[in-house]
Structures are given as structure tokens and as C-alpha cells.
Amino acid sequence: MLPLTEDEEIIKQLVNTCDGFLFTGGQDVDPKIYNEVRTKQCGESCTQRDNMETELFSLAYEKDKSILGICRGIQFINAVMGGTLYRDLQTEHPTYTVHHQPHPYDKPIHSVKIMKNSPLHKLLNTDALEVTSLHHQAVKDIAPNLECMAVSEDGLIEALFAPCL
């Protein structure tokens, strides 16, 4: 866990101290990061977190640190690398696949297809996984330096990787 700060010197110290970074779930990624406008369907975002994580990601990427994103984290990484997001899945990507599951949250709700020759396929040696899902934003257009490694039944991108790293 890192302190929430926009102090560039503290962020530089964190990058120099840590071997890698996990960008986690949480509030929405602010649409301005991927050149969109906020709509009434957008959820809460945290400008301070977006600013800190943008600087942190930039420095960590520049220094070739290990970076992993989960949920909001993968969406954030895609956005700061030049990709776009669906601001609200219900209105921008209506589908039969449940991406905002009800309780219990630990029970898989849908499956994802793992792309052949992806790091995830090589790691798990499987073509599909059952997953939980609790988000209303998602990757829309993949950033130029990223590739898809898993998609849901409705074609929504569920996992990305950077082949150059």
C-alpha cells in the first residue's frame, strides 16, 4: 500500500524503492484520461488517485518496473497508454453477459476465452476460465502497445499484456 500523494518527489522515491507495482480496483478512471467527457452514468472517481497513479505508472514504466493491473488497474493502464474505456457498460455495451454480478461475489458468473500463445494461456495451459465480475467500466479500444489475452463471451476485453515487456 502506498500513501495517496501528488508530491512528485515522494512518487519518485516510491518508484526507486519498489521492484514493481500493482494497480488495483476502486473508483472509476476519470474519462478525461482517455479523452472522453463525464456522463451521468459515470461512477465516482478520485482525481488525486488518478493524478498520482498517472505519474507513478509513467515513472515505473520508464524504469522498466514490473506492473500488474487488476480490474480498475487494467482499465487505468490501458487508458494512460492511449486506449479507451466504456464509461458505462450498461449503456455503451449492452449485453446478456453479467459484468456486475450480485452477491455472492466470490462465485464465478461468466467465462472468458484465453487467447492462444498469450502469457496467460502459457501460464494456465487452458483455453477458458470461469471468473467473477463486478465492474461497469471496461476496456473499449486497446492501447497501441498492449494486446488482448482474454475476452468474455460477449467480446469484452478481460485481460491485456504488453508483448514488448
What are these regions (language model features)?
Residues 26-29:
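Short glycine-rich anion-binding loops that position phosphate/pyrophosphate groups of nucleotides
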Residues 33-51:
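A short, gly/pro- and small-residue-rich
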Residues 33-34, 43, 61, 81, ...:
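Ubiquitous "structural anchor" signal
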Residues 87:
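Class I SAM-dependent methyltransferase SAM-binding "motif I" and its flanking Rossmann-like core
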Residues 11, 31-34, 78-80, 160:
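Short glycine-/acidic-enriched loop or helix-start segments at secondary-structure transitions
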Residues 21, 59-84:
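Catalytic nucleophile loop
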Residues 35-38, 81-84, 146-147:
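Short, glycine/charged-enriched secondary-structure capping and boundary segments
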Residues 1-19, 23, 46-63, 90, ...:
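Amide-donor transfer/coupling interface in amidating biosynthetic enzymes
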